[in-house]
């Protein structure tokens, strides 16, 4: 399982311009040509091969965060280093790398000095504060890079940089031990990976979905139990199984978390990955009696990203994807927001299409 630079790999000379999909105003995605820039100190230039379309891209596309327009979205980008900026060490031209939501830590703030790179005070979010991967070329901080194992195609690796990393990191840091019951609520873009990771980490896995049509998929992904929230109370169903030590919430909505909270066993934790504006209505009695907890988990740092990719390669965890040409990003984004993706849409560039030679996608 190698992730080292390909020996003898040469990249074609980069042209003076490249194709990108940028947002110039809320909800306006357009294909443009941009001039190629040189990487600055501590940065690398990447020839993008694939970039996942993530629900969090709506923060940029819909202007939910303060944005300096125009901006290129995309934070599940995989490609090859084309140029190194001054001072970059440990990376090589031709090496295949990934860039996730966290654009790179500063290394000197209070949180970095205490080892908490996720909450770096000077962290830039890829595709929000800096241009992301909906493009043939991007510039990224070297401190935010992840190594891509040869086991994955670029398109197959892309969703693991956000959806995979987020679920893997939350489960790895969860207060559950192998053999204990872990529930994954939602079998979508995050949940279908969460079920796989939970199974391969040795947990007893309950998948919670809506409707009977997801039952077969849940079992195929590795769930020991399937709970249909449309047919029964999921909290009661979890208690019938002995109570969950952890409930991983991959679907947005405070009501969703609250509806399952009583399914936790004493000392259990509900970990929220789904961002939404709804308040979480849980009584203090539900928290205190049984000492149950609610926590949020944003994502993981680049080292955890490396671990996510290695673990996925070793265990066979993979994202269910469909690929779309970069130029069709607007249509792909619309389908994703309408809930029509099954389960991750990945944009591929011309470089990505020409390099589809990996063993597994």
Protein language model annotation of sequence segments:
Residues 174, 206, 212-293, 353-356, ...:
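Glycine-rich cofactor phosphate-binding loops and adjacent beta1-alpha1 units
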Residues 97, 150-236:
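Mid-domain Rossmann-like dinucleotide-binding core that forms the NAD(H)/NADP(H) cofactor-binding site
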Residues 37-51, 62-110, 149-152:
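Glycine-rich beta-strand-centered segment in the early N-terminal region that forms part
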Residues 269-271, 281-322:
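Rossmann-fold dehydrogenase core element
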Residues 3-16, 258, 302-361:
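C-terminal hydrophobic helical "lid"/dimerization subdomain
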Residues 105-185:
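NAD(P)H dinucleotide-binding glycine-rich loop of Rossmann-like/cofactor-binding domains
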Residues 24, 35-36, 68-74, 100, ...:
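Short Gly/Pro-enriched turn/cap motifs at secondary-structure boundaries
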């Amino acid at each position: 399982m190698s992730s080292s630079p390909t020996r003898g790999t040469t990249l074609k000379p980069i042209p003076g311009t490249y194709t990108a999909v940028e947002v110039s105003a809320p909800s306006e995605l357009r294909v443009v040509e941009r001039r190629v820039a040189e990487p600055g100190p501590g940065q690398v230039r990447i020839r993008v091969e694939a970039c996942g379309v993530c629900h969090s891209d709506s923060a940029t596309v819909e202007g939910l965060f303060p944005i300096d327009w125009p901006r290129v979205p995309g934070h599940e980008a995989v490609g090859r280093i084309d140029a190194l900026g001054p001072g970059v060490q440990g990376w090589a031209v031709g090496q295949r790398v990934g860039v996730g939501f966290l654009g790179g830590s500063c290394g000197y703030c209070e949180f970095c000095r205490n080892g908490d790179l996720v909450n770096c005070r000077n962290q830039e979010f890829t595709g929000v504060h800096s241009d992301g991967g909906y493009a043939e070329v991007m510039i990224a901080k070297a401190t935010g890079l992840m190594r891509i194992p040869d086991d994955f195609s670029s398109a197959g690796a892309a969703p693991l940089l956000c959806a995979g990393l987020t679920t893997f990191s939350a489960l790895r840091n969860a207060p559950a031990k192998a053999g204990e019951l872990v529930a994954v609520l939602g079998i979508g873009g995050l949940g279908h990976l969460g079920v796989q990771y939970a199974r391969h980490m040795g947990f007893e896995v309950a998948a919670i979905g809506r409707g009977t049509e997801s039952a077969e998929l849940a079992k195929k992904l590795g769930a020991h139990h399937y709970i249909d929230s449309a047919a029964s109370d999921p909290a009661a169903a979890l208690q019938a199984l002995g109570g969950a030590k952890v409930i991983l919430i991959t679907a947005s909505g405070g009501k969703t978390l609250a509806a399952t909270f009583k399914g936790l066993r004493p000392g259990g934790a509900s970990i929220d990955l789904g961002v939404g504006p709804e308040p979480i209505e849980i009584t203090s009695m539900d928290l205190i009696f049984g000492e149950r907890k609610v926590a949020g988990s944003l994502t993981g740092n680049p080292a955890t990203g490396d671990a996510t990719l290695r673990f996925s390669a070793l265990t066979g965890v993979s994202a269910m994807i469909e690929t779309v040409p970069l130029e069709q990003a607007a249509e792909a984004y619309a389908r994703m927001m309408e809930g029509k993706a099954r389960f991750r849409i990945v944009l591929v560039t011309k470089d990505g299409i020409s390099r589809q030679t990996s063993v597994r996608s």
